[in-house]
Regions:
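Metal-dependent de-N-acetylase/amidase catalytic core
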Residues: 1-6, 82-243
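Active-site rim/loop-helix segments in enzyme catalytic domains that contact anionic ligands
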Residues: 1-96, 230-237
């Protein structure tokens, strides 16, 4: 079986953070969804590889994914080279998604969004998606052309190309995030502090479109629109001040 939308994450929890709400929404609408984790996050400060595998499996179940794969790249050593692109292209050919999601490829280097693996994964998946349609490459499976490549986990100061309302899925999304207990639970406060931060970001993004919660995405090229009225949706009232 193939999927309609396939998200690539450098580590367990990347895709859940950046596009988990979208995946829940699309799954609810009947689309087939999947996530490919490049690494098991073995260099993380908390959580062993075994624990991380258990957590990503739980998250995949909570998301209702139709496909999930953990590849054999090394944490903090994800590289965009020819052989790695072939690996990504193989997955794309096998799963044949219409849309591919990947971490954004640029931004201030360092922790979080600027993690070296996030940026490398952005380049790697972009080139792998391109390789997937090239017939001359020595790959199994028939060539496949992805219709749209979209990016998540981009610097907050960058404007998104479009924003998706995930208000109806916010509670489910939070439960998905909590599956990654080793990463999000703060034993010093006995609370999921980082989850609260992510919800606040989604709240801010939602306000920008008149929704309660939303997630934004960047498209590398203009998105074709045949009927602008298909883009028009009623704005939810999101009061910020007493009236």
């Amino acid at each position: 079986m193939t999927v309609d939308i396939l998200a690539f994450g450098a580590h367990p929890d990347d895709a859940e953070i950046g596009c988990g709400g979208l995946l829940l929404k699309l799954k609810d609408r009947g689309y087939r969804t999947g996530i490919v984790y490049l690494t098991v996050g073995e260099m993380g400060s908390r959580g062993t590889p075994e624990i991380r595998r258990q957590e990503l499996t739980a998250a995949a179940k909570a998301l209702g994914l139709d496909y999930m794969e953990v590849m054999d790249f090394q944490d903090c050593r994800v590289v965009d080279d020819f052989d790695s692109r072939l690996k990504i292209a193989c997955v794309v050919r096998q799963q044949r998604p219409t849309i591919v999601l990947a971490p954004y490829w640029d931004g201030p280097p360092g922790r979080g969004v600027g993690h070296t693996d996030h940026q490398a994964a952005g380049y790697l998946v972009s080139h792998g998606v391109n390789f997937a349609h090239l017939r001359a490459l020595p790959l199994e499976s028939e060539p496949h052309s992805v219709s749209n490549l979209l990016y998540y986990l981009f610097p907050r100061e960058l404007p998104p190309s479009f924003v998706v309302d995930i208000s109806d899925y916010i509670d489910q999304w939070v439960e998905v995030l909590k599956c990654h207990h080793s990463q999000f639970y703060n034993p010093e406060t006995t609370h999921y502090d980082f989850v609260d931060t992510l919800v606040a970001v989604a709240r801010a993004r939602g306000v920008s479109i008149g929704a309660r919660y939303a997630q934004g995405f960047i498209a590398p090229e203009p998105l074709r629109v045949d009927d602008p009225f298909m883009l028009v949706t009623p704005r939810r009232r999101t009061p910020q001040y007493p009236t």
